[in-house]
Amino acid sequence: MFFTVRTLSNRTSHVLNCAFAQCRLLSSTASAKGVPRLIKAIQGSSKEPLTDLQLRLIGDNRYGEDSWFVSSTPKAETMGVADGVGGWRKLGIDAGVFARELMSHCSEFAEQAEYDGLNPRQLLIDSYDRLKNKRPCNVCGSSTACLVTLHRPDCTLHSANLGDSGFLVLRNGRVLHRSDEQLHCFNTPYQLTVPPHPAMDCVLRDSPEQAVSTHLPLQPGDLVLLATDGLFDNVPESMLINQLRALQGETRAEYLQQAANRLVDLAKTLSVSPTFQSPFALKARANNVDYGIGGKPDDITVILASLEVPDKL
């Protein structure tokens, strides 16, 4: 089980790759009067510098071993992040490929015209089954997964979260909801796994049915922040609120993008600080793990969205 536990990296050996932080402005294709939509901004960064060749090989929708997607249908909008478990590197396996393939399958299902976003956990189940049963199966590894959907007809948010990626919803400058982590033990999140050999019994194999599902009604101006643990392990909730409070009701994509950029920059800075008392360091202490103080270098992926309901005719 050792290679499914995230390694506590030597923080001095990693340099965050600023050049790999790619800016993206995305908004929903749905613009009909009265139809709810999410105005989205995406940003991220890899914890390790990548060459131009590596960037071309891993393609879009990846920041290191993190991956993400967004999709839109007449009835739903869907956002997802996955964090490949880096311990597989000891076996020469790039868990980022697993995360990317999982998100790719989620995107394919979520882009079907009839998809309504009411059951993101079933979306995760179907996507994992497709990945697991794909032939030839040349993808192995494991990752966390967090899916968030907007069901347009009743303006309701639905979610499915497995592991320690997560999301929070802010309204009027306060946290309305935050997802809970799922951990086997410290730094060992629940994870979906396809081992290189079916008989391999020394790896964690959690089920997508174990993903925690929630739903709550949204209001215009609500903010949804979806991210991998590279953000949450380094930026306390109070700092997140301070960064986002001024965005309440903001639906201009450029302002959301600037905020997403600031969040990633803040997480990168704190992740390499030797003196900051990070959420990760506090959790380590609570679990009697000798980590000391400081941040946790990691890949970071952030999707920031604001709910807009255009005026009805």
From Swiss-Prot:
Record domain PPM-type phosphatase: where: 47-307
Biological process annotations from GO: dephosphorylation
Q: Does the keyword Magnesium apply?
A: yes
Write out the GO MF terms.
Answer: metal ion binding; protein serine/threonine phosphatase activity
Q: Which reaction does it catalyse?
A: O-phospho-L-seryl-[protein] + H2O = L-seryl-[protein] + phosphate; O-phospho-L-threonyl-[protein] + H2O = L-threonyl-[protein] + phosphate
Q: Which family does it belong to?
A: Belongs to the PP2C family.
Annotated PANTHER family: PROTEIN PHOSPHATASE 2C (PTHR12320), PROTEIN PHOSPHATASE PTC7 HOMOLOG (PTHR12320:SF1)
Name of the protein in question:
Protein phosphatase PTC7 homolog fig
Native source organism of the sequence? Drosophila virilis (Fruit fly)
